[in-house]
Amino acid sequence: IQYVGNYPSGEFYINNNLVCIHGHKVGAKSGQSVMKALGDARISTIFGHVHRLEMAHKTIWTQGRPKIYQAVSLGTIARIDGIVPSGSARHNWQQGFGVVEYDDENFQVDTVGIYEGRSIYRGKVYESKGTD
């Protein structure tokens, strides 16, 4: 794990076409935050500000060629049962994380949801052994 400073404006470039940020754009409903992030996209972005699992793509044509941008929110690994301080006891949050495969130019982002302490990724079940 590498610390990226200057919260909330720090950036970590995974490659030439994908950056990780904290993020600041929020949509009230599921899917709206990634759509807002794609509005002025010039690079694909992974962000976590909204604590939801969301993913969207946008194709922009330039010089007769498609350029595809992606915005991804990977959810949260925080508790979502109201114990985490916030403005409400119940939010539209989802637990999850992401796995990114990449080279210098291309990437693949997989979102992995965590449901009641369990995830399935590439056919294998992962289960929390933590305490309540």
Language-model region placement:
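Metallo-beta-lactamase
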Residues: 1-17
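A short, compositionally biased
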Residues: 6-9, 94-95, 113-116
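Conserved beta-sheet core of the metallophosphoesterase superfamily
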Residues: 17-112
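Polar, enzyme-active/binding microenvironments
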Residues: 110-130
